[in-house]
Amino acid sequence: MGEGRRTILITGASAGIGAALARVCAARGHDLILTARREGPLQALAEDLAAAHGVAATAVVADLAEPNAPARLFEAIAARGLRVDGLVNNAGFSRTTGFLATDPADHAAMIRVMLTAPVELSRLALPDMVARGWGRMLNVASLAGQMPATGGDTLYGPIKSFLIKASQGLWLETQGTGVHVTALCPGYTYTEFHDVNGSREQVSAAYPKWMWMDADRVARIGWDAVEANRPRVTPGVANNVLAALGGLLPDALALKMVGGHARRLDRL
């Protein structure tokens, strides 16, 4: 096994793309540190993957919306005698109620979970990765980070754009160190993410099936990309076309087109 057995920390690992990435890493022989807020699903996944693949899988409950959560998470990992060879920044959520109708506390939590926490976790993990001459960092961004802004889910796309740019900067800074950094930019992916934010029926009706991908396929593409040291990967031909168009169209036209989709989704 060319990669060797390493320990990968995955945030938001209890479901969706995070759980799919845990399955991919376990299947490739890596030990796991899985973290999320929900202890039951997290522990069940850890036990299932350990039994299925003969890897060590440790569940550590953490809420990255809480202040200083990344530092406390690393303290808990060290207390268990574990180290982090790879980091998957996957935890995230959205609110689709519009900027003014969303509780400011929810917006603050979004920023902490999807922007501040990845930065802090990266800062905690990278020094040891560089010192050991091996590391993998996969930042789960979104196609939304490459597209024009949408109304309703006002902060989600900008936060994901930040994650893409930060990943590219880290990719440049870690060249020649043995550390690989990749931004994974999935489009519409079948996960429970849409159940949590209440949008599954709306998005399923608004977009054709060919625009959707399976979480396990997205996870495989993402992990293959970080192993290949690609700075960014957007799974799916359709998603790559959309990302390219999003960068080429004039702002006024692009925003008008995206605004039409937002109205179809009742300001999703």
Which ranges hold each PLM region?
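Conserved glycine-rich cofactor-binding loop
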Residues: 14-15
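Conserved glycine-rich Rossmann-like NAD(P)H-binding loop of the short-chain dehydrogenase/reductase
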Residues: 28-45
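Conserved NAD(P)H cofactor-binding loop of Rossmann-fold oxidoreductase domains
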Residues: 90-95
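Substrate-binding pocket helix/loop in short-chain dehydrogenase/reductase
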Residues: 98-100, 106-111
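Active-site helix of classical SDR
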Residues: 122, 158-159
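Residue(s) in the substrate-gating loop at a strand-loop-helix junction
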Residues: 142
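C-terminal helical subdomain
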Residues: 183, 205-241
